[in-house]
Amino acid sequence: MKYLYVLLLGGLLSCNAQNLEKSESKPNIIYINVDDLGWMDTETYGSTFYETPNINKLAESGLKFTNGYASAANCAPSRACLISGQNTPRHGIYTVSNSDRGNEKTRKIIPIKNTEILADNNITIAEMLKQEGYITGTFGKWHLGEDPKTQGFDVNVGGAKHGNPGKDGFFSPYNIKNIVDNKKGENLTDRLTQEAISFIKEHKEKPFFLYLPYYAVHTPLSTTNALEQKYKEKGGNPFQNKAVYAGMIETVDRNIGLILDEIKALNLKNTLIVFTSDNGGIRAISHQDPLRAGKGSYYEGGIRVPYIISWDGVVKPNTVSKTPITNLDFYPTFMDILNVENLNKIVDGTSILPILKGKTINDRSLFFHFPIYLQAYNFKIDDGRDPFFRTRPGSVIIDGDWKLHQYFENNEIELYNLKTDLGERNNLVDVHPEKVAALLKKLKSWRTEINAPIPTELNPKYEANFVPKKFKKK
């Protein structure tokens, strides 16, 4: 009898160990990707105007990264990096629409042609997870083609090529494809969340990948009268004071709370939750000081974004990491969690699973490549490099405390120490020539390795002294 008890106990322990191993290897994954949310646009990251109690709660349950980056400074390329696990030169998506943005007489060189749709033969993060037995669903902005169901998603609500919901599109009747109107006046963020919750309930018995790329808080800004009035009465500060935008953030936060409540109600403890933004915020809407510039710029305001990761039993609650990460890191991280090896594709980024478990990863450089033009919003507000463009063709390397910008038009260099100058105001290119040389060598080596295209052909229509009419003083 005693021998039988030992056998039974051993079997139970073995089963429990196997179940634990299986549980950790196949967590549910929820990736919340807010559109155009700036680094400073939540209470968690220092805002005193926007109210985000549920995002605070998520941070208290998990790990907050203070040096997180999007892999590109605007919507489509950042999303392509996340979904493909590859940096921009590999998938060729550098911006939204055409690459020759701005007035042609202000562009000194001819930019590299932009790719607008993620190639069907690129094995996406959803396809990789499907191969591992996951049910996959996306609820919101896709922006990489007409239908994410052709690229690994079993369920798609609201995802198409649209970059924003259009005029009055945050309330039903909707302007976007792949969503059916319910009652008039329904809020799009609310609807996407309810669809996501239905997906969770339906697939709670199997591992699921829930991609929740809200259209909010992208323009056109829109909220309820009640929320707008609330934040008008609250008032803000010179940097954050847009009541409608604040209402949109509160709506996103409330809906994140509903997701967290559902996970708790269903006791889905083995759920990895990521909260982030696709790029920096639009400076005319919300400043990210001390960061310089905003969406579309490769200064910190355009690429530094919030990251919060929660995973019960794995990620230690209420912790902070200063390790730099990017959205390129999640594809290899999910592969690492699932022990996926032979994927038959190159994946950039680094697994951050050791960080989630309280360990460290090796130091590495981060690279950004933007061989095209992106016109300015409003130079008086953009806080950019020149009046005509948010950024001109160039590359960036971040290596430890150091950040180097190289611009292709004139081979101009900017060097900043982010530890002492997070706002990128003090160009140290003449002070540290040895650091410039070392970083340029790394940057050029990376571009060669990844086969990054560099524009060199001069634009015959360029006029050095030309000033577009809207920039001329009246």
Where are the language model's segments positioned?
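Sec-dependent N-terminal signal peptides
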Residues: 3-12
